[in-house]
Amino acid sequence: MTTNKNPGIYVHIPFCVRKCNYCAFLSGASDEALRERYVKALCEEIRIRARLMSDHAHGVFDTIFFGGGTPSLLTSAQVARIIDELKMNFDIDSEAEITLESNPKALSMESLKGYRDAGVNRLSMGVQSMDDDILRRLGRIHTAHDVIRDVQNAREAGFDNINLDLMFAVPGSSLETTLIDIEAVSRLEPEHISFYSLQLEEGTAFFKEFERGELKEVPDEIDRAMYHAGTKLLKEKGYEHYEISNFAKRGYESRHNLKYWEMAPYLGLGLGASSFIDNSRVMNVCSLDEYFNLTGKGLAPSAEVHENSEHDNVAEAVFTGLRKVEGIRYEDVLGSYEEFWEYYSDVFEEAREYEREGKLVICEDGMRLTDEGIDISNSIMALFV
């Protein structure tokens, strides 16, 4: 499932109605005036980046991804302005995949039609669960009924490519509730389902509860049982497992996210956004005041720039590539089997041990994690970093 190496664009919208208990993303509250000011600054950054990149050939951008936060807090007119600005300043493929992240209850039929008219052709909805008790525990403001209504409305508005996010291993959940969630979501027939385990992140409400002893993590063995049972059920429902946490009907894999897993270039725009362009990792500033100040002066809002070394590129290609169920091909990383394992000769025996344990498959043309290997994927990937 190797994608092309055309670049993509990520647009960060750092606003949400309310911070969820588990969320560690760069996001916060806003009003209409702040969102409008941000859209203007974002359009200015687009023009700044285009000028800075004009001396380099980057090819045709064939994905745009609005992430957050909750991008659907922007009006369809604001989303249209951003897309139009991108098209005026960059070469955007006429068949580009344009994704907008959204939350149930934050969508109206009018806004859905407006997003579709603006050029958005893929909708990603943060469902997380179809159990109202679990949704309340997560700090979500929607209900299962909201999800059903919004998916139906999205279909009526013309969306034929919808992703629904599901979360498992939430305190208060069980193997049974996890499978019930999958059954309920699959009845809505989305083209794509993301299936993530809850991670306790520092700074979140859940982490503070954990530190106070008020929250107990789901034990690892139950977390893994939920993952494997969920994966099995998703496959039975006709979804292909193509990345550790992602499942899609054939032909509906996330073209944008594949760029991250296959080391394709991408431009990040907006507060705290990261880019991988011209062999450099660039991170934008995380202060909204600083972002407004720099873009207002016609300056790129970059906080950090790191030029990748050869080892950075090799290590990142292996680390991200092993997230794909099909794994990596040596020719995409270092060339042949011999060249790859000569470069990684110091960890060859450890890799072989994982193979003997049934956690890693090493072939003449590449390697991949097994289902058991996915359970300890970070340990295996760390060998190559």
Regions found by a protein language model. Give the residues of each.
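Short amphipathic alpha-helical interaction segments
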Residues: 340-355
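C-terminal scaffold of the Radical SAM
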Residues: 4-6, 24-52, 60-341
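Local cysteine-cluster metal-coordination motifs and their immediate loop/turn environment
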Residues: 14-27
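Short, amphipathic alpha-helical interaction segments positioned at domain boundaries
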Residues: 372-385
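N-terminal [4Fe-4S]-dependent radical SAM core
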Residues: 1-9, 56-58, 376
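Alpha/beta-hydrolase
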Residues: 11-13, 127
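Minor-groove-contacting beta-hairpin "wing" of winged helix-turn-helix DNA-binding domains
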Residues: 366-370
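A short, conserved structural fragment
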Residues: 355-365
